[in-house]
Amino acid sequence: MTEKIRVRYAPSPTGHLHIGNARTAIFNWLFARHYNGQFIIRIEDTDLARNVKDGEKSQLDNLQWLGIDWDEGPDKANSKYAPYRQTERAAQGVYQKYIDELLASGKAYKSYKTEATLKEEREAQAQAHQAPHYVYEYAGMTKEQIKDAQAKDEAAGLKSVVRFRVPENHDYQWQDLVKGEVKINSKEIGGDWVIQKADGMPTYNFAVVIDDHLMEITHVLRGDDHVSNTPKQLMVYEAFGWKAPAFGHMALIIKAETGKKLSKRDEDTLQFIEQYRELGYLPEAMFNFIGLLGWSPVGENEIFTREQFKEMFDENRFTKANAKFDAKKLAWVNNQWMRSEKEKVMPQLIHELVKAGLINDQQAKNDADHLAKIIEIAGVDGIKATSEIAPLAEYPFFKLHDISKEDRQSWLETDDGQKVAAAFTEKIKALAEDEFKAGHILQIIRDLQHDLQIKGRPLWNPIRLITTHEVQGPNLPEILAVMGKDWTIKNIQLTVAV
């Protein structure tokens, strides 16, 4: 591309970073980085009632965790475009200037209709099987009559909003980066719409145009649910005679199991970045998975780094079909990343043992190599998130279960069980410290199989029980070798004492 790319991610601080919003941020970031453009963060915080404490901080923190940086934003202001919060821009009169222009030109007007009146109109339209639309209250009036009516409403203490006058029967069309040509007639808009609320704040569809124009945004990549907003925004661009940016509306994200739209209100589905962070998913894996929601790379590979995404990004490879959010696929992607980055992830895995109360911080620091071996044997290659390692490693590495009465009767109180337990104990005690390795321990068990003519569970279960108090678990010789001779003998003595 020859023009200088400027794209933005403009979250509302009304909650945590959602999978859908993260995708918007990721693809705008990739677009900017691929074309050596600029990626801007703008905070759209005009919905004061819904803004939550630390909402902005949470959004930005999770973006950084995903590996997304920005060229401009609330913390990286460029004086030419600042400020980067809409409330601050509103306080400076940025939007009021343009609202006044539209009022003066007659392209917008003040409306004093109450919520009760609007509700009655919507109900009447529903009963008449009509699409909801705004009914112009000054129809047939002269300018003087309108002025008098508004003065009376003002005197009565009614609050006004400002509505944009929608052109009649006008087609708004654009060449969408994802969907191709899109055309929507003004009749589908729902009538004149609010550009300034009663509290003086601009509405989303108005403020976003002013901001994108003043910040020289060249491309707007966002979710498919914004298609219906685009005609409203285009009519504002037309009203001021401004060039609109290129629009791209990415495919809807749906749940793989149900085919329904991924909804923030669906509490049965984990769909916020913060939730996956808490579970121990890796940022590289989250970026990787989200980067394939509605975008298709060349070839069959599904595991990519951020740098690879940046290099191969192509806006022509967005898919039109709905993107499936598959939690199992995300778990698989995270597992692949954990396995390939095991050394890098190991400190996080060890920290999970600290969080679970299995070790303290000092042990985590001093015994890192030993703990890494435990984690490896416990089955790290099979988990989908780091938080799953503590339950796997807890027994028998840090705690021992009580041997059940049933297991004791089945495997330790039989003639064969007693023979195996006694013979293994004798041989393991005789094994030198420097030979206490998995290979030597396995050979002892094989020799017992030959000498006692006992094999399978009757051989292995008594040994497992006296050493780990479990009849199932990871590779037994490896467990004993890692935990050491003293630990093994101590457990055997504990079993005999019981």
From Swiss-Prot:
One of its GO terms (cellular component) is cytosol. It comes from the Bacteria. It is found in: Cytoplasm. A motif ('KMSKS' region) lies at residues 261-265. A motif ('HIGH' region) lies at residues 11-21. It catalyses: tRNA(Glu) + L-glutamate + ATP = L-glutamyl-tRNA(Glu) + AMP + diphosphate. Belongs to the class-I aminoacyl-tRNA synthetase family. Glutamate--tRNA ligase type 1 subfamily. HAMAP family: Glu_tRNA_synth_type1. NCBIfam families: gltX_bact. Catalyzes the attachment of glutamate to tRNA(Glu) in a two-step reaction: glutamate is first activated by ATP to form Glu-AMP and then transferred to the acceptor end of tRNA(Glu). This is Glutamate--tRNA ligase. It comes from Oenococcus oeni (strain ATCC BAA-331 / PSU-1).
